[in-house]
């Protein structure tokens, strides 16, 4: 073991007669060497350059130290590595791994670090939709939204026969006086109400969950069909989206839907016989029992036509638990029991993805004063999520991390300590020899390199 002495440090007792000390004085060392996989993932999917192209920079080139592409990459890679707070970058701008990922090793001016600190990144997040005197970097929301759909389409090797788009709205609690802040009775807090499809879109919480869904679906589906003209599309969502305008749009545009339906007395009366049968059998067996029924239905005022409803008549814990869904799928295409249990209930997986975005990628960190800035933050978080998902999909299939959450991937594969050796010709990251995930890390690195080569040299 190498013996070192330090003037300043922390004392942690002794082990076998040797004093244990620690200090932040090792120089070129990084705790995020595994993040090299993120750079390899970006080369495999070509995301960061296209995301940076969604920004317009009107700063004077001769005065610029940090270009937009560097700033965007630094922010997204930082979030993916677990640094959601811009304050972290005042130290990370000296980190060799972050410099490698951002693609900038040396500063042009002596008084600058190679990459940006918190103030410069904050100005990026506060960028306007158009350049102003004090904000020279602007972003194009439509281009960013289009890129998100492009990345989804490109994640498929070939056009699928059918895709299912899950919609959901969730609360993003507010703890300040942000623009668009309203109290939401269901969530019992002041919040935003972002609409998630495969990315998030911020809305004021005063809106209905389904508000804006028609416009978003029209845009997304049109873009998907330009690439996959024959794909069948099913929209799946809870009862908050069972609105006549959305269902009518789906019917007019050849899009299938499967939405939860809020129960009422008329619907429950429709399945009274099935509930009685389920209750009788439950009393005999002592177990929950359920029956299913499919029927045509129309509301008294809000719907413009009759639609197929599938009901689950369930008796559990001594009481009725009826549930309903409305769908455009015909009976000959999908039987009632399979439709509810296998198709509709599978939407619960989206709840896990939303939790992953908010807990592992910090998508609820929306403390900027304006909705515009908070929306841009949400897009940064979304890009970091896409990057980690691509790492999982391309590099980690058939490994122990194939189904791991983004947080687990970060902890086990990205948070690896390394000594950094810099020479004229190379930068060597000497990672910890005792890394438990070294084998899977190596597999991912090889797979991502192959994918990047295939992207650079398409057949």
PLM regions and their residue ranges:
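Structural motif
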Residues: 61-70, 368-378, 404
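Acidic/histidine-rich, metal-coordinating catalytic segments
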Residues: 168, 232-242
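Acidic, His- and aromatic-enriched active-site or binding-groove loops in soluble protein domains
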Residues: 186-191, 218, 252-267
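Dynamic "connector" segments at or just before major functional cores
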Residues: 1-189, 193-209, 217-222, 226-227, ...
């Amino acid at each position: 073991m190498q013996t070192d002495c330090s003037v300043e440090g922390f004392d942690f007792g002794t082990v076998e007669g040797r004093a244990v000390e620690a200090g932040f004085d090792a120089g070129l060392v990084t705790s995020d060497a595994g993040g090299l996989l993120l750079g390899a993932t970006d080369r495999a999917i070509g995301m960061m350059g296209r995301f940076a192209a969604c920004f317009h920079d009107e700063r004077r080139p001769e005065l610029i130290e940090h270009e937009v592409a560097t700033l965007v990459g630094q922010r997204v890679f930082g979030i993916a590595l677990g640094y959601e707070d811009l304050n972290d970058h005042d130290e990370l701008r000296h980190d060799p791994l972050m410099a490698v990922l951002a693609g900038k090793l040396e500063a042009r001016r002596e008084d600058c670090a190679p990459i940006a600190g918190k103030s410069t990144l904050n100005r990026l997040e506060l960028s306007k939709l158009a350049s102003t005197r004090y904000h020279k970097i602007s972003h194009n929301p439509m281009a960013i939204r289009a890129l998100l759909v492009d990345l989804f389409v490109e994640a498929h090797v070939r056009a699928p026969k059918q895709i299912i788009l899950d919609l959901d709205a969730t609360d993003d609690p507010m703890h300040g006086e942000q623009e668009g802040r309203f109290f939401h009775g269901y969530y019992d807090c002041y919040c935003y109400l972002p609409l998630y499809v495969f990315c998030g879109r911020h809305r004021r919480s005063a809106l209905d969950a389904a508000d804006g869904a028609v416009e978003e679906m029209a845009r997304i589906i049109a873009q998907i069909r330009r690439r996959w003209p024959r794909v069948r599309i099913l929209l799946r969502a809870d009862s908050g989206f069972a609105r006549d305008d959305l269902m009518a749009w789906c019917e007019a545009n050849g899009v299938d839907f499967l939405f939860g339906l809020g129960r009422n007395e008329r619907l429950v009366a429709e399945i009274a016989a099935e509930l009685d049968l389920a209750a009788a059998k439950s009393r005999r067996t002592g177990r929950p029992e359920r029956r299913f029924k499919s029927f045509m239905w129309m509301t008294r005022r809000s719907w413009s036509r009759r639609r197929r409803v599938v009901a689950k008549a369930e008796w559990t814990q001594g009481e009725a638990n009826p549930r309903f869904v409305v769908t455009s799928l015909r009976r000959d295409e999908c039987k009632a029991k399979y439709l509810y249990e296998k198709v509709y209930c599978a939407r619960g997986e989206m709840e896990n993805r939303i939790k992953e975005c908010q807990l592992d990628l910090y998508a609820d960190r929306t403390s900027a004063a304006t909705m515009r800035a908070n929306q841009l933050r949400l897009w940064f978080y979304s890009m970091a999520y896409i990057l980690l998902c691509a790492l999982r999909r391309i590099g980690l299939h058939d490994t122990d991390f194939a189904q791991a959450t983004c947080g687990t991937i970060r902890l086990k594969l990205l948070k690896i300590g390394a000594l950094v050796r810099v020479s004229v010709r190379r930068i060597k990251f000497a990672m910890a020899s005792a890394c438990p995930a070294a084998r899977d890390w190596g597999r991912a690195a090889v797979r991502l390199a192959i994918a990047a080569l295939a992207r650079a040299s398409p057949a």
